Amino acid sequence: VTAVHNIKSNKGSRTAGVDKIKMDKYLQMPKDELILLIQSSFRNYRPKPARREYIEKSNGKKRPLGIPTVLDRIIQECVRIIIEPICEARFYPQSYGFRPYRAQKHAIRGIINVINAGCKSPDQPVWAIEGDIKGCFDNINHRLLLQKLWRIGIHDKRVLKIISQMLKAGYMENDLFHATELGTPQGGILSPLLSNVYLNDFDWYVGRMYMEPHRQCKHKGNDTRRLKWAGVTPKYNYRYADDW
């Protein structure tokens, strides 16, 4: 029931998938009947292909969007509710995209704080390396993703099977079916969480390259000042979605 209400509150909740069934149908169903339908779908999950649409980006290019059926969105939201707390407990602290109670402003504030703590004077330059993972959602390896889910703590094979089937559901474009061997559909409920799972090892690897071997103080600001006066330049990793 929570999953249904979460989907209902989403901006695109009234958009139908390839089956052309809208959210209103499920909202009009008796509660017990809807719960039985969701339970049955869990036991015999066969996701339908996503409906491919394109939305314009600010640079004039178009970004592909995969719109699952409403029932598939409800199933994905159920899975998200189950696995998100497990994943959150293992995520890198300075990862800010697609996470509860985190936003761009928190990433910006963290970056400003380490800059202010690390500068001897207002005129001291601070270097930043910006990276953008090209085609991040479209190039996620399904096998590696499932392995990372297992390592992060998702050990229920039924849940892993549902995620695997969702990844391989494909999409429909101009009445033609296209298989998906790589990537997670942009527009899928689970895709943002799965992208964070996939990039979590990267976050920890880069973050530990500098801070972990030098960590002595409880507070990061104190470590920054100590290393600064020792002549060691502090380095930090901040990521928001596919930008770091």
Go through each PLM region and give its residues.
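Conserved polymerase palm-domain catalytic core
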Residues: F42, P49, P93-Q94, H106-W244
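Extended, charge-enriched "interface" segments that sit outside catalytic cores
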Residues: M23, L27, S41, R46-K48, ...
